Regions:
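Intrinsically disordered, low-complexity polar regions and short flexible loop motifs
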Residues: 377
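Short beta-strand micro-motifs enriched in acidic
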Residues: 361-363
Length: 434
């Protein structure tokens, strides 16, 4: 499965609306989903579902979302919590309220230390709260209606050091994937600028630094795996596990040191844009693997179709149950949003087009790019963009993209919902040098 954008907000907005970015108007971290946009739970409620959110949503800029609900979110139960470490007094932070009521010392510690508070206890961890609250929603649901439950974990996510220490015991470092080496200085200039902005302290880091980051990432995943079992158990206790559609996915990936890069952004390597997608359909008894190209916007139509709805009003969103498949996957980056808040003269625009065999990454600001023949070069080490023999393939992929983008531009006329800033951030000064 490929994310529509390699950063949180636009990617999640695509998943929740069944549209790509020009359709809903959310392009970067601080954009606000227009108030006339209806999300998936809105339509599921029309199908007779009880709808619930526990945890992260992030379809609009955080400063907006922790203070105001989108009128079209469609949730009957709205236990939003953006992340574990900030906005502890915000109107919409169900995790902070739970901490204050049950673990006031931990609430005060997080209030004082923020993201610097490392290695939270398993008892007070964000993933623990999400799972426990989700299990409560399942057990206390309106049994006269079917339930749609959206579970939003924060992990795995930087700063990679808030996992419970005991979860390290679940790890087997000998099975960590080997780091894919690369020369960042040989990459397109726009990608270098992006990398220097997003991860200046760790750019090119190897050895102990990389092992520490990977340990934190995998420990967070392992602890999350344990917590998800609480939700499965609640479904089984209620006798509805077999009849439940379960989807596990993510809004973006993390480079974790591969190709010398960390974090996220306009980095279209598989580690950053190819996200997990695990699906259990109702009464499914046997597993299988699929090589079909799937996009996050497809989750909208997949769920709505399973609920008995007709998702044809979202033509870009292809249900997994259907026969029609994507000819190619596309990930778009229109800046993370921080550059223009800080007064930079322009933001970075980049696009990835990926077919079954090829991947083309276009950096529009610098007219440079990357081309990888994935069947022969799955680790994306050999950039063929400047190879004259590949000029025809680049043109073919660009025409494929332009044809699709023209059709999309004709069909969409989305509003923009405004911007949500971070207090004091607009006055910050940041100089990035290569």
């Amino acid at each position: 499965c490929y994310c529509n954008a390699p950063v949180c907000t636009p990617s999640r907005a695509c998943m929740m609306t069944g549209k790509t970015m020009p359709g809903h108007g959310v392009y970067n971290l601080f954009d606000i989903l227009p108030e006339n946009e209806k999300m998936l739970p809105y339509y599921l409620r029309e199908q007779g579902y009880e709808t619930a959110l526990v945890g992260k949503l992030h379809v609009s800029g955080t400063e907006y979302e922790v203070n105001k609900r989108n009128p079209g979110d469609g949730f009957d139960i709205y236990d939003l919590a953006h992340e574990p470490s900030v906005y502890t007094k915000a109107p919409y932070n169900a995790y902070a309220r739970w901490l204050l009521e049950n673990y006031p010392d931990e609430w005060r510690a997080i209030r004082a230390q923020g993201r610097k508070r490392k290695h939270r206890s398993a008892e007070t961890h964000f993933s623990t709260w999400v799972s426990q609250r989700s299990a409560e929603v399942i057990r206390n649901r309106d049994k006269s209606k079917p339930l749609y439950l959206q579970v939003g974990y924060f992990d795995p996510h930087n700063p990679y050091d808030h996992y419970p220490l005991e979860s390290e015991q679940l790890l087997h470092p000998e099975y960590y994937p080997e780091v894919i080496p690369d020369d960042v200085s040989a990459m397109p200039e726009a990608l270098q600028l992006e990398a220097h902005y997003h991860c200046p302290a760790t750019l090119g880091a190897t050895g102990d630094t990389n092992r520490k980051i990977r340990t934190g990432y995998f420990a967070g995943v392992s602890f999350l795996d344990q917590q998800i079992e609480k939700i499965f158990q609640a479904l089984k206790d209620e006798g509805i596990f077999d009849n439940t559609l379960i989807i596990y996915t993510s809004d973006h990936g993390d480079m974790l040191g591969d190709h010398g890069l960390y974090s996220k952004g306009a980095m279209f390597y598989e580690q950053g844009v190819n996200v997990p997608l695990i699906v259990k359909f109702p009464h499914q008894t046997q597993g299988c693997r699929s090589e079909d190209l799937v996009m996050l916007e497809d989750m909208f139509s997949t769920i709505y179709t399973a609920a008995g709805g007709d998702a044809s009003f979202r033509p870009e969103s292809l249900p997994l149950q259907g026969e029609k498949k994507h000819e190619f996957a596309m990930t778009e980056y229109r800046g993370c949003g921080k550059f223009d808040l800080m007064g930079f003269p322009h933001i970075l625009h980049a696009t990835m087009i990926r077919t079954a065999e090829w991947k083309l990454n276009l950096y529009h600001d610098t007219c440079d790019g990357q081309l990888f023949h994935l069947t022969e070069d799955p680790q994306e080490k050999n950039n063929l963009y400047h190879d004259p023999a590949c000029a025809g393939k680049i043109m073919e992929l660009m025409q494929m993209y332009l044809r699709y983008d023209t059709e999309r531009d004709y069909n969409y006329n989305a509003e923009r919902g405004g911007r949500s800033g971070i207090p004091g951030f607009a006055k910050a000064i940041c100089e990035i040098k290569l």
